[in-house]
Amino acid sequence: MATTKRVLYVGGLAEEVDDKVLHAAFIPFGDITDIQIPLDYETEKHRGFAFVEFELAEDAAAAIDNMNESELFGRTIRVNLAKPMRIKEGSSRPVWSDDDWLKKFSGKTLEENKEEEGSEPPKVETQEGEPAVKKARSNPQVYMDIKIGNKPAGRIQMLLRSDVVPMTAENFRCLCTHEKGFGFKGSSFHRIIPQFMCQGGDFTNHNGTGGKSIYGKKFDDENFILKHTGPGLLSMANSGPNTNGSQFFLTCDKTDWLDGKHVVFGEITDGLDVLRQIEAQGSKDGKPKQKVIISDCGEYV
């Protein structure tokens, strides 16, 4: 059946994971038609695994490629195609409600989860409606050394949310490391508006008309799961829907009117004071008072 190519088994789930968390983690890969998290009716807790059904088989395949062996709430999860047993013709009961099926295909996960009991997974606070941040080793961390005029201003350290927007995060990471032969080093923040944002990333024309992504000229909006909830968030600048390149901006304040229009893909973890120094060089029309240069950039490995 074609359905089997669209239903994924997700094992190794932490106790805190629910259908909302799973939906947020898997929706970047395509439309989801159903999420099932089987319960242990004695404990009234889930059994450590779930089933996610995509509308398209290719989206399910993309989810496996990106999510298998990734981390969610401090645990490494396994993601692969579900292997349903044959059930009686005409039955509308999902195969994963059958105890024999569960014993056959979920036993390993249940045992592993029992072994891990006693070591509580770290609690992660998130903005309402946003997925939890994975451990720092799963999400890349990058930095930019900033120079204002001729003086060093300090370093901005950023966490990239590859758990939510892997394509957008990878583009930015590569532009920080220059591993594709081009990137941000030596480019400027060409547009700075106090109490709004600081925009940079045009390393070709240096005025907001250029730049390019590692995928070619432009790439599509990946998703709008993360929101512009406050200062220090990293988001893609664009010239309309699906026109992402290399230009980005750092928010100086909450900018929720940009939600659904610009892809948020990271946040400052250290160096918010440096962002405030950049912001101080701005003006109402966006023209910087002094040159603000990315003198160096790279990835923490």
UniProtKB/Swiss-Prot annotation:
Taxonomic lineage from the root: Eukaryota, Metazoa, Chordata, Craniata, Vertebrata
Where does the RRM domain start and stop, copy by copy?
5-83
Assembly mode: Identified in the spliceosome C complex. Component of the XAB2 complex, a multimeric protein complex composed of XAB2, PRPF19, AQR, ZNF830, ISY1, and PPIE. Identified in a pentameric intron-binding (IB) complex composed of AQR, XAB2, ISY1, ZNF830 and PPIE that is incorporated into the spliceosome as a preassembled complex. The IB complex does not contain PRPF19. Interacts (via RNA-binding domain) with KMT2A (via the third PHD-type zinc-finger).
What is said about the domains? The RRM domain mediates both interaction with RNA and with KMT2A (via the third PHD-type zinc-finger), but has much higher affinity for the KMT2A PHD-type zinc-finger.
Which reaction does this enzyme catalyse, per its entry? [protein]-peptidylproline (omega=180) = [protein]-peptidylproline (omega=0)
Please give the residue ranges the record annotates as the region Disordered: 107-137
Give the family per the record: Belongs to the cyclophilin-type PPIase family. PPIase E subfamily.
- Sum up the protein's function in the record's words: Involved in pre-mRNA splicing as component of the spliceosome. Combines RNA-binding and PPIase activities. Binds mRNA and has a preference for single-stranded RNA molecules with poly-A and poly-U stretches, suggesting it binds to the poly(A)-region in the 3'-UTR of mRNA molecules. Catalyzes the cis-trans isomerization of proline imidic peptide bonds in proteins. Inhibits KMT2A activity; this requires proline isomerase activity.
Listed name of the protein: Peptidyl-prolyl cis-trans isomerase E
User: EC number(s) for this protein?
Assistant: 5.2.1.8
InterPro entries recorded: Cyclophilin-like_dom_sf, Cyclophilin-type_PPIase_CS, Cyclophilin-type_PPIase_dom, Nucleotide-bd_a/b_plait_sf, PPIE, PPIE_RRM, RBD_domain_sf, RRM_dom
GO BP annotations of the record are: mRNA splicing, via spliceosome; protein folding
Q: Which GO terms describe its cellular component?
A: catalytic step 2 spliceosome; cytoplasm; intracellular membrane-bounded organelle; nucleus; U2-type catalytic step 2 spliceosome
Q: What is its main location?
A: nucleus
Q: Name one GO molecular function term.
A: cyclosporin A binding
- The source's domain of life comes to Eukaryota
Q: Which residues carry this modification: Phosphoserine?
A: 91, 97, 119
Q: Where is the PPIase cyclophilin-type domain?
A: 143-299
Provide the protein's localization.
Answer: Nucleus
Which species is listed as the source? Bos taurus (Bovine)
Q: Where is the signal peptide?
A: none
Q: Which UniProt keywords are listed?
A: Isomerase, mRNA processing, mRNA splicing, Nucleus, Phosphoprotein, RNA-binding, Rotamase, Spliceosome
